[in-house]
């Protein structure tokens, strides 16, 4: 997609998986750049990408101003490095579904400041283990078992009983140029020398998915052209390919429909899930989160947004 092409409010809402009213609110708060054509508000893809990048820090979605908490910083694992205050509940992960969830928490969870930390699945679990957050989200695939999340929760939270709560299922696959000129169809195509990759950052679920498949095929990542070129979101992976700067990237299906010049090769269904420590499961805030996830009101937020299978939302998947 051309970075300067005009996007409508609905286009941006679809890309970010939020309601149109939320887009207007982001503009009003100065968090999302825009311009006007007559009386119509318009955006560029660069505006949306900048918003995503600027959002990758601790924020309180319920406040009108940008409320990044400067005392929460990143350690060498990409995790947070301060224990939250007693009235703070930090939900960690990168899907914008979590922005909607924390907004609902601000509405329904009394005496709690619901905060967001925008870091990937692996680092989220490390932060949960260290006590820097209360809820991690993860979509990590274990190549040996073919299972999502449970093996990683057990490894990264040793000795800590945890509860895994289902959020949504999404389809992961390859972004390729329109028409698939390189005829890319499976993981085996990564063995080819004529393909350039655009990668996600270490610890992201899509990065782990790629690395696990490479491991199973006996391929070193360093042998792939472009493997060390990393970006921080599905959107920037897709837009890099649309510009011709790479041939292939791993991401979720929804974004492919939002970026011109991109086709999507579906590969596998993934599970995106919430992880909390069992010791806080019976607290009012966690029980409120369960009620929110299971409510028709919350589920209706995703009714008109493609790419989310919410049929199991709010179900307890495993106790570790």
Model-derived segments and spans:
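Periplasmic-binding protein-like
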Residues: 158-159, 164-171, 259-291, 310-318
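Flexible hinge/capping segments at coil-to-helix
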Residues: 167, 176-197
